[in-house]
A protein has these predicted regions:
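Single conserved hydrophobic/aromatic residue that forms the stacking wall/gate
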Residues: 1-8, 13
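Conserved phosphate-coordination/catalytic loops
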Residues: 36-47, 143-151
């Protein structure tokens, strides 16, 4: 329902859920909602998500979809059914592996790249960029089990949008897309279903950008700074 206000976004970057039932390795053992579904249910979920993305993106708007390689078939099929063009698959190469239960430990994540047909897509970089992205992963994911480095999110955003344009992230998690947009002067529309990650994102944003005011809207009313601070504090107590 909330996505109707997001129509006109110039770009979408999406991370999670991957449907791999991931659990963080920190003492908090953080998890992700909707990250363990039966195959048919997950395929339906993806089609619904990508249909919403298609509806709100402008023609020519680019997307970047991080995903698990084991679910690549579902992601590609769902993107095509929604109407998107799949142009390339980029690879985020991490500086260290992620310990798991498979024979070969994962040290990369694929990221599908393409755009909504109907207009020319933006490309703001040179012709020397490659499909291999080398960015160190965070040393500790205390905020979110799969927190992305801000520099990683800023890289494709810079390539496929311009100053002041709207970047949509409908699974914002730890808020790395929001932080990246703030650093490179884009407008970020972010959505997150889990209250603890919403609160964590707000705290992270306030710590990184203390000069920026943060205000919340509740029941259609824009709260002042003090009311916002009180609500954040109350929500933090509930989560703890």
């Amino acid at each position: 329902e909330m996505t109707s206000s997001l129509v006109g976004s110039e770009m979408c970057i999406r991370d999670r859920p991957y449907n791999v039932n991931y659990e963080g390795s920190t003492e908090e053992e953080l998890t992700i909602q909707n990250d363990s579904m039966e195959n048919d249910l997950f395929a339906t979920f993806l089609r619904q998500v990508f249909s919403v993305m298609f509806a709100v993106l402008k023609p020519g708007g680019s997307y970047y979809i991080f995903h698990a390689d084991s679910e690549g078939e579902n992601f590609r099929a769902s993107l095509r059914k929604a109407g998107f063009k799949i142009a390339q698959c980029c690879i985020w190469v991490k500086n260290t592996m992620v310990m798991g239960r498979q024979d070969y430990q994962w040290q990369h994540e694929p990221c599908l790249y393409g755009w909504k047909p109907g207009a020319g897509h933006q490309w703001n970089s040179d012709r020397k960029q490659t499909t291999v992205w080398n960015f160190d992963k965070p040393q500790r994911n205390a905020i979110h089990p799969t927190m992305k480095p801000i520099a990683l999110m800023a890289y494709p955003i810079s390539n496929s949008s311009t100053l002041g344009q709207i970047v949509l992230d409908i699974f914002s998690g730890s808020g790395s897309t929001l932080m990246a947009c703030q650093q490179i002067d884009r407008i970020c529309y972010a959505m997150e279903i889990d209250p603890k990650y919403v609160t964590a994102t707000i705290h992270r944003y306030r710590a990184m950008f203390p000069e920026q005011p943060v205000r919340l809207v509740r029941n259609g009313e824009l709260l002042d700074v003090e009311q916002t601070a009180d609500m954040i504090a109350d929500q933090n107590k509930v989560i703890q």
